[in-house]
Amino acid sequence: MDNEKGTSSSDLTTRQRKPLGWKAMPYIIGNETLERLATFGLMANFMVYMVREYHMDQVQAVTLINTWSALTNFAPIIGAFISDSYTGKFNTIVFGSIAELLGMLVLTFTSLVPNLRPPPCTADQITGQCIPYSYSQLYVLLSGLFLLSVGTGGIRSCSVPFSLDQFDDSTEEGREGSRSFFSWYYTTHTIVQLVSMTLVLYVQNNISWGIGFAIPTVLNFFALLLLFVGTRYYVFVKPEGSVFSGVFKVLVAAYKKRKARFTSGIDYHQPLLETDLQSNKLVLTDQFRFLNKAVIVMNNDEAGNEEWRTCTVRQIEDIKSIISIIPIFASSIIGFLAMNQQQTFTVSQALKMDLQFPGTSYLIPPASITVISLLNIGIWLPFYETVLVRHIENITKQNGGISLLQKVGIGNIFSISTMLISGIVERKRRDLSLNGVKMSVFWLTPQQVLMGFYQVFTIVGLTEFFNKQVPINMRSIGNSLLYLGLSLASYLSSAMVSIVHSVTARGGQSWLTDDIDKSKLDCFYYFIAALSTLNFIFFFWCARRYRYRNYSNEQ
């Protein structure tokens, strides 16, 4: 919007209005929370929708879900670039909210208009082959999913950075607010996910798919209204142009001066610009020293081409911070694989288990089993933030109790444990099922609880890490690295499912078949556990060598 105003990096310039902190949060978080109600509620039960209503087999449904999930998680990196470079965070969130609303409308129509999906299976067809979906029906379905992905790219890339803009990090209250924000942010998402995984799923499975899709669609509309209502409370930060131009400038300048040598009394390029005033407060670090040469002022740095021959200390240290988080980002991709499997194959397991709630005749919707994980998050996160952190701080004398990467590392251990327990439970379930006995679905509880702990530590930790360890003018991009990692993990998961299915089938029996009772899903889980263990060793090595940066204090 035109009323987005810039914030400078020094005391010489001020924000248009004083940051109001938590007063602005209900409107920003409320918007994204309702957005996740739509996407998470949809993803949790969408496999059932495609199998029952579009007559897809399990492999087709899993492949489509993983592909859509990957696109949805990749979209925020595009939204972040557009936001940080051109449109600003608020405008990007508004655009994303509108696209998401349109996507939900399309999917709602697919459930209400019979011609937009295949006809129901008849009694004779159930034992044979049901009428498949047509290409036109598939295109309508995919268009709705695409709009959802576009909307997600605008909302998720900017909600957290836009929220952090509302805290004044120059005050103790503002710093404490921004630190605790991440836990409460994830807690609100968990509560809404509980609603989507219980109420919405119940409506979809027992009343109507149309009503089940219409509920989050209506909520998305109110989320957009809520975002506009809160405009009087927001602080707007003006984008500074292409955020990657500074990166390329440093690389070009460092290459051109690769033969230069540092000597005593050397000149540094330190212009006192409003957008870069803090650069004269920094010193060059010895990390990635080959980039330091970009700051040297040479005799042939004429005014005409100086822009691409000289860089500030600020620009050089910013690109160093980006390079230094790449190994952590890479390790997170493998770490997400365990979560991917819990979101796909757990539903397949539940469909083959006893879904009856103990002591009642109520049948639990298969996709609702992940509610156990959400309950664990909803209980543990507030307890951790309000009680446990204070005690840990007294012991470690460190703000937050433990470092961000220590938190991520603890979560990775839970991820490995999740896959090991999942393999043990699946082996027992399959053995009983082959003997005509259905295991209670509540045997999936241990792995769901462990996955909840993984999200509490790793997902929350990575969200804070990627937002606080990048330059402030690149926060949207930093925040989107989490979703980029999830996207790449989804693609990797799809590729692994295909490769494992193809390779193991050569031996006569594939680990992953349409009939889970004839599969060896437990072996696949153990394979993911082994990969996660190797990944944890790599992460530990990288984390030990990482140097933290405090951009709030620099600003």
Curated annotation (Swiss-Prot):
The places in or outside the cell where this protein is found are:
Membrane
GO CC terms, sorted: membrane
Q: List the CDD domains hit by this protein, alphabetically.
A: MFS_NPF1_2 (cd17416)
User: Which InterPro entries is this protein grouped with?
Assistant: MFS_trans_sf, POT_fam
GO molecular function (one): transmembrane transporter activity
Where, by residue number, does the polypeptide cross the bilayer? 62-82, 93-113, 135-155, 181-201, 209-229, 234-254, 319-339, 363-383, 405-425, 441-461, 480-500, 523-543
- How does the UniProt record describe the way this protein sits in the membrane? Multi-pass membrane protein
Q: Which UniProt keywords apply?
A: Membrane, Transmembrane, Transmembrane helix, Transport
Q: In which tissues is it expressed?
A: Not detected.
Q: Which ranges of the sequence are coiled-coil?
A: none
Spell out the Pfam families in the cross-references. PTR2
Which family does the entry's similarity section mention? Belongs to the major facilitator superfamily. Proton-dependent oligopeptide transporter (POT/PTR) (TC 2.A.17) family.
Name of this chain's protein: Putative protein NRT1/ PTR FAMILY 2.14
